């Protein structure tokens, strides 16, 4: 199944600054109940620089990790966050903009420039790679041979990272969990009716573990 055309109609009017301020103030009130903060920016809505900065600072003061799914033109909104998610084509675009030789070089330079802790790159058939501020990287290979669709890949990765944070998983296990969530999306027969849930994720991890055991890896 392939999505050939999508037409989203949104209002062009800017959201009143009073409303944006109220939303961010309300979000700050509930931070103490949060395991993680997720920022998803598609260039519309309430992701504005001052508000995002306030949330990131408040989360940092409360030791709450921040996960960001940024628009490439809005990376300045993500300075100092813990987890940032790119798709492979996004990293390649940034590699060209930064004029570096490899995606690895681009990833580590982005981490340094924006003070991120981790950059997660989801690559579909090429699996998942997590780059970290200490210069290390971890890769989880995709185990699927039949990839059906990719819609919702980044959303699945965000959910998996949030789960990994709540379970206090290390980077290596987080990469495996993100890869499992992405494989659930890649193997889905229909993007419209599929919803990632706990059972699907557990089943996928079980299949991955079995495949690794069979191949003795």
Model region roles, listed by residue range:
Residues 92:
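Nucleotide phosphate-binding site architecture
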Residues 6-8, 35-39, 67, 85, ...:
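Structural motif
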Residues 19, 47-52:
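Residues at alpha-helix caps and immediate loop-helix transition turns in enzyme cores, especially N-
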Residues 81-89:
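Non-cysteine beta-strand/loop elements that form the S-adenosyl-L-methionine
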């Amino acid at each position: 199944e392939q999505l050939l055309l999508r037409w989203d109609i949104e209002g062009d009017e800017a959201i009143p600054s009073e409303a944006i301020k109220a939303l961010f103030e309300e979000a700050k009130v509930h931070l103490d109940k949060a395991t993680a903060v997720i920022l998803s920016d598609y260039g519309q809505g309430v992701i504005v620089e001052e508000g995002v900065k306030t949330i990131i600072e408040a989360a940092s003061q409360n030791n709450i990790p921040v996960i960001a799914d940024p628009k490439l033109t809005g990376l300045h909104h993500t300075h100092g966050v813990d987890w940032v998610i790119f798709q492979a084509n996004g990293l390649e675009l940034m590699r060209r903009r930064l004029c570096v030789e490899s995606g690895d070089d681009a990833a580590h330079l982005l981490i340094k420039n924006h003070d991120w802790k981790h950059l997660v790159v989801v690559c579909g058939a090429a699996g998942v790679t997590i780059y970290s501020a200490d210069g290390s990287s971890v890769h989880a290979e995709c185990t699927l041979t039949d990839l059906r669709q990719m819609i919702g890949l980044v959303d699945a990765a965000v959910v998996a990272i949030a789960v990994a944070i709540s379970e206090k998983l290390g980077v290596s296990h987080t990469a495996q969990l993100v890869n499992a969530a992405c494989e659930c999306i890649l193997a889905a027969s229909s993007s419209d009716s599929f919803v990632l849930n706990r059972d699907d994720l557990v089943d996928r991890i079980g299949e991955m573990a079995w495949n690794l055991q069979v191949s003795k890896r």
